[in-house]
Amino acid sequence: MWKSVIYLFVLLLGVIRAEDVKDLRNNEVSIKGRLELSEIDISAYMIPRCSFRLYQIGNYSADKPFHQITRIKDKNGTFEFNHVPINHGVNESTYFVMTPSSRDFNLLPQRVLVEVTNIFNETTGKVEQQLKAFRNYFGREYFPSKDIHFPDKLEEMDALPYISIKMSKMLPFRDYLQQRNVGLLQSGPLAGILNSKWKIAAVITLLALMTFPYLVEKLDPETARAMKEEARKKQREKYVVKEE
């Protein structure tokens, strides 16, 4: 009798696992992320200038690897990859690589290895997906060769409730279009003077010294004559020989 009960229990457990694996074939997951720009507010202008790419690596059950590009959904910086397929079977892992891209910022991490593993929960009797994320950089392998004794391990990062992407620094301004025929005020000696505050100040001072005598002569002729007379007097004194 006990053998029959145990046999039925094992059979029932196998049926449950088989049903879970069967349902898993059409199972899909969503991978969520968030762009954090510290004190910079995410504007409507910035949303289309940031994108996030997810592509599948390693073994995959479909004819070709999964690939999807998404953008920021709101001003909080949240983004999401929907209908992401996973491999069949319990304890099977599916791997994806997520790369952020922005026209305005350098974002970190540069690449994120996402691991989705099917875990059988004995308490609920259902198959659940375990999500992990690992920080990666250009030039480092996702899966090191087994011949390497001490391979570099990827640093694990928080994957729940979302994968955090942060700003490293602002990108420099890039002027892709350059005007071929520029004016005199944009290139040449005159442009060099206009683009320098010190040169402009020197030119203004020189013009003021040159025009000052003419302005005084027009506005106050008597003062102008007195100044000229004083200048002649000093000039004559240079050639006067003092008698002993």
Curated annotation (Swiss-Prot):
Record's signal peptide: 1-18
Topological region Cytoplasmic: 217-244
Compartment list: Endoplasmic reticulum membrane
Residues carrying covalently attached carbohydrate according to the record: 59, 76, 91, 121
Entry similarity comment: Belongs to the SOP4 family.
Function: Involved in the export of PMA1, possibly through the monitoring or assisting of PMA1 folding and acquisition of competence to enter vesicles.
Protein name: Protein SOP4
Organism: Candida glabrata (strain ATCC 2001 / BCRC 20586 / JCM 3761 / NBRC 0622 / NRRL Y-65 / CBS 138) (Yeast)
